[in-house]
Amino acid sequence: MPLEQRSQHCKPEEGLEAQGEALGLVGAQAPATEEQETASSSSTLVEVTLREVPAAESPSPPHSPQGASTLPTTINYTLWSQSDEGSSNEEQEGPSTFPDLETSFQVALSRKMAELVHFLLLKYRAREPFTKAEMLGSVIRNFQDFFPVIFSKASEYLQLVFGIEVVEVVRIGHLYILVTCLGLSYDGLLGDNQIVPKTGLLIIVLAIIAKEGDCAPEEKIWEELSVLEASDGREDSVFAHPRKLLTQDLVQENYLEYRQVPGSDPACYEFLWGPRALVETSYVKVLHHLLKISGGPHISYPPLHEWAFREGEE
């Protein structure tokens, strides 16, 4: 069974269409909502552009490192609303009489999630701890009642897409730090031009290989990654130059091995776990990590970002 649930890429100017179960934006439903769920979920995709947020509301943590301005400013999110199509109340009341109000609220909530992801990426690059009070004051503001779900969804998104985990180190005062998932010591942030951590992509590639056995054909890797908009030959994805990242950078870092399949003619290539990956993690840990985030046996990927700016990129 394919590792991902297929989704169609669409350009930001064309809007977004439903893309299946967007992992990282599904598992953070409020407990009461989960208990009351009696029917299948329906999804609404909302595009959130941080450039639309007034400057006074944009998160700007102190002591941001050089190059922080090159961080992505546009994030596409999926807002999941539970539908209770079989309920008698809905049949009696009919369609919502406040569709515009509901849509406006969803957009506002998505904008806050986008702001928080941006804020957390800046904190990670600066290697700075942060507190709940700082998030509430700098980002969440008037949405404090919705902080738990906003924080949970933003944290899940960071884990899956970027391979970054939020860890609470001091319960009193709620002090947090950001670390790479699974104890991996690589994040790809080696220079000022590096915009986002690459650990998430590494974990997904390692999971694809683990799922296939000891090795995975190159075409299988690109097939699975196509849903991440990191397909072979696509150099404008969130993971800039994905082919170079997989076949050179991660090979040089000893996380992956990239070799020709013995006896193949024409030449075919395959990926294997490198020695560094075998030392730092395991097949079981990688697969369990993705299953834990997805909350079920089927792994799917969220729609990734369409970056508004590429400052510092070649």
Swiss-Prot record:
Transmembrane segments: none
Domain called MAGE: residue spans: 109-308
Gene Ontology cellular-component terms listed: nucleus
Keywords annotated in UniProt: Tumor antigen
Tree of life domain: Eukaryota
Tissue occurrence: Expressed in many tumors of several types, such as melanoma, head and neck squamous cell carcinoma, lung carcinoma and breast carcinoma, but not in normal tissues except for testes.
Signal peptide positions on this chain: none
Basic and acidic residues bias spans: 1-14
GO biological process annotation, one example: negative regulation of transcription by RNA polymerase II
Primary role: Not known, though may play a role tumor transformation or progression. In vitro promotes cell viability in melanoma cell lines.
PANTHER family reported for this sequence: MELANOMA-ASSOCIATED ANTIGEN 12, MELANOMA-ASSOCIATED ANTIGEN MAGE ANTIGEN
Protein name: Melanoma-associated antigen 12
Organism expressing this protein natively: Homo sapiens (Human)
